[in-house]
Amino acid sequence: MRPRRRGLAYHHTKPKGQLSQGHYPTTSNDGQRRKVGNSEAFQSFDIWKNLDRIRSTKKNAGQFIKGSLLILPMRTEDKQQFDECMDELHKYISKDILRCYPQKEQKDEGMLFYIVLKDFNILDSCFVLSVLLAFQKRLWMAPSEKSYFRVPKNINLTGSFYLPKNIETGRGHIITSYRREQPSSSIVEVGFNVVPDFQQFQVKACHVSKFMNELSNFFSQVEFGKCEANVINYFKREYNRTYSQISLALYELPLIGDGLFDIKSYISKTRPIIETSKAQMIKHISEMKAYNEISGLQGDQFPRQQRPLSNSPSSNSISSSQTIEAGATSYQTQPQRHAVNKPSNVLNSSNRHSGPKTFEDGRYSEGNKPGFMTQDEIKQHCIGTIKASMDAVKKKSSYQILKTYVRCPRQNYIDIVYQNLNDLRSKTNCNIVVLNLNNLHESQMWLESLNTTNYTIFAQAPHPSTIRVISIGGVGEYIVKALELILNILEH
């Protein structure tokens, strides 16, 4: 028996110079007979052995594909190791075929690289894609693995590469023909293309041998069309634009603070404006406080000078006589019809406590009832409270927020106020409310502080059943306008 002929041994040590296209190192069979069976049954974790298998099963594996172009976007945080991996690849493949285009680094996203294969052959595509797809997982799945040309068992090849959309195949659709031969194909055409004029292919391979076998069959059917000169720049621009849109949709809230505005420059521009506004507000508040204090002191001085002492009988008689004279003088100016139709209010008020008064029909009048006021007297008293409130508000700042209270006759006039309540609120921008009996007590302090003797001779408060109290809240100048409108209702 003749001795078995040993095969030629090729050591895949790194050559001194760069190898030409298609001349990758081959491996020895270590004296074992080479099996030329089904290529899908062959499995090895060594990239060189898998390349040797592709070379033996594909006759055109070393022939370059005319007009071929493949782009593989890669994102990595370890730029140093990536540069070392690219240097190792360039030892076996020319830089005219394998090119790398770095993208500007973005915060917390790592460095983006565009790996471009141009005018390549089947061995080039299998070699580059296997090494780079394994590199993405090797950094954290197998950090102890030092060789870039061995794919450990626990690493799956996953990723996406892009081809021009004008590719053609000799046997119908690429993925359709693949699924006839291998239902669970590791290379799948993506239905939705994120980059215009480019077709995306997704890789999901559990073993490097299966991936290389399917990739070699894939490119053996592909025919590339003609591409524009600036196709790489076009791809980079469109890919980056699409990625930015996706990032903006996913990370919309963080970009408001970090990506859309330059916070430092924004603060430097707005800080002086805010400080100026703050200083003006502080100055305005101090001026308002000083003005209110001065107005309050003046308001306290005037009523004390005009208010007579309650325990002095002489002052009471003098004030009552002055009141009667002033009332008589004021009522002389009223129209003649008031004097004819009803008796004088001066006589009624002066003779109120003098005893019962009889008319011609013999009936007694109600002048003997203490505290009784006619409707006209009640109206004059309410007008006096409105005018006194206007003077009290005018003594304060026109920008101060106040709450005032005035009286209104229940008969006839309060219904008119109710009908015009919404109109009064809209014209004055004040909160105008007619108080009920349960919250009537809140107006007592304000009404007692008013000095109505300067505006009416009927200074005593009418019976609560004959009047209603109106509350007006808002800014000082608007309250004055609201009081003028209510006064206009009572006078006309």
Swiss-Prot record:
Residues 1-35, 300-371 are annotated as: Disordered. One of its GO terms (molecular function) is mRNA binding. Residues 1-15 have a biased composition (Basic residues). Keywords: mRNA processing, mRNA splicing, Nucleus, Ribonucleoprotein, RNA-binding, Spliceosome. It is found in: Nucleus. GO terms for cellular component: commitment complex; nucleus; spliceosomal complex; U1 snRNP; U2-type prespliceosome. GO terms for biological process: mRNA 5'-splice site recognition; mRNA splicing, via spliceosome. Pfam families: Snu56_snRNP. Residues 310-321 have a biased composition (Low complexity). InterPro entries: Snu56_snRNP. Residues 18-30, 329-353 have a biased composition (Polar residues). Present with 361 molecules/cell in log phase SD medium. Component of the U1 snRNP particle, which recognizes and binds the 5'-splice site of pre-mRNA. Together with other non-snRNP factors, U1 snRNP forms the spliceosomal commitment complex, that targets pre-mRNA to the splicing pathway. Component of the 18S U1 snRNP particle, a subcomplex of the spliceosome. Interacts with the nuclear cap-binding complex CBC1-CBC2 (yCBC). Directly contacts intronic sequences of substrate pre-RNA. This is 56 kDa U1 small nuclear ribonucleoprotein component.
